[in-house]
């Protein structure tokens, strides 16, 4: 039985193709029960690799079934047919994804970015409180509903965190995601704290929201890693970002995993909290550290004209809600160059100012 017939029997009228990979595709469909359009991810077990079937797909299905948050794509139904096809019926991002939105409209104003970033951060806190990590946070996985609210999608790399006998989270050894959003410890192949990895990716996303460009050029991974480990974050002067916004980004893009912000610290940061905005620069001391953890510590260097931010170039192809690449094997670095996936230009922004550099981070074991 073909997909249209299977979906028809379940009360869905199949629509257009939204995306297709080697063993999965996404179709739009109209739900006769819900009375609106949905997205249907169809996975063919016969074509999928064994590691995906044995590890990643069961994790994704388990996690999708347990999540219920206003800023996470809803999963309405999951079913499987006798011929080995899995159907995941999900909320449709009717306004596309955040990357295409920014490519079309440019960088967001801080108030709009704050709203969207708060929605995303609230979704991540919800997940982290459940010991669920996403591990593939990027603008393409942030869908927009009819009112342009953020809907976190694609839990293909997600997992439940395990704890040891003392209650500490066990480090992850699956190195996954896109290089442009990957934390330094992941790029280096070091076993990592998955929740802390998510925080780095949040920092990259916020940078893209307010700058309209990537914070790092991933065409040269070794060079990018060196810049990241030196804690260099360059902001376009033309964007006139507030110190509070730069400070939050700088703290999330902290190479030292022991100093990187926790999700609760992000949500309590003065830029995210409406009542705390407008903090005077007097709260920052000479060393660039604030008197409270949530106050700005970012200090620009006058005259700096470094090059690391990479422009986003418009793409012709629309982004689908489903990932098409296979999942990685354990202990194998599988980060993907973002420029290969989304058509980023290697041209660099020159109109930048650099964040206050820190000492190189200590080796994390």
Curated annotation (Swiss-Prot):
One of its GO terms (molecular function) is magnesium ion binding. It is found in: Cytoplasm; Cytoplasmic vesicle, Secretory vesicle, Acrosome; Cell projection, Cilium, Flagellum. Its EC number is 2.7.11.1. Residues 331-347 have a biased composition (Polar residues). The modification Phosphothreonine is found at residue 174. Residues 12-272 form the Protein kinase domain. Mg(2+) and Mn(2+) were both present in the kinase buffer but Mg(2+) is likely to be the in vivo cofactor. Testis-specific. Expressed only in postmeiotic spermatids at the final stages of cytodifferentiation in the seminiferous tubules (at protein level). Not detected in released sperms in the lumen of the seminiferous tubules and the epididymis. Its main location: cytoplasm. Testis-specific serine/threonine-protein kinase required during spermatid development. Phosphorylates 'Ser-281' of TSKS. Involved in the late stages of spermatogenesis, during the reconstruction of the cytoplasm. During spermatogenesis, required for the transformation of a ring-shaped structure around the base of the flagellum originating from the chromatoid body. ATP binds at residues 18-26, 41. Pfam families: Pkinase. It catalyses: L-seryl-[protein] + ATP = O-phospho-L-seryl-[protein] + ADP + H(+); L-threonyl-[protein] + ATP = O-phospho-L-threonyl-[protein] + ADP + H(+). Residues 303-330 have a biased composition (Basic and acidic residues). Belongs to the protein kinase superfamily. CAMK Ser/Thr protein kinase family. Gene3D superfamilies: Transferase(Phosphotransferase) domain 1 (1.10.510.10). Residues 282-365 are annotated as: Disordered. The active site is at 136 (proton acceptor). It comes from Mus musculus (Mouse). Autophosphorylated. Ubiquitinated; HSP90 activity negatively regulates ubiquitination and degradation. This is Testis-specific serine/threonine-protein kinase 1. Disruption phenotype: Male mice lacking Tssk1b and Tssk2 are sterile due to haploinsufficiency. chimeras show failure to form elongated spermatids, apoptosis of spermatocytes and spermatids, and the appearance of numerous round cells in the epididymal lumen. Elongating spermatids possess a collapsed mitochondrial sheath.
